[in-house]
């Protein structure tokens, strides 16, 4: 993790 996985989250660590 640590990258933008979802367009909704800027951090991308949550999802």
UniProtKB/Swiss-Prot annotation:
The keyword Protein biosynthesis does not apply. Keywords: ATP-binding, Kinase, Nucleotide-binding, Transferase. Its EC number is 2.7.3.5. The keyword RNA-binding does not apply. GO terms for molecular function: ATP binding; lombricine kinase activity. It comes from the Eukaryota. It catalyses: L-lombricine + ATP = N-phospho-L-lombricine + ADP + H(+). Belongs to the ATP:guanido phosphotransferase family. Homodimer. This is Lombricine kinase.
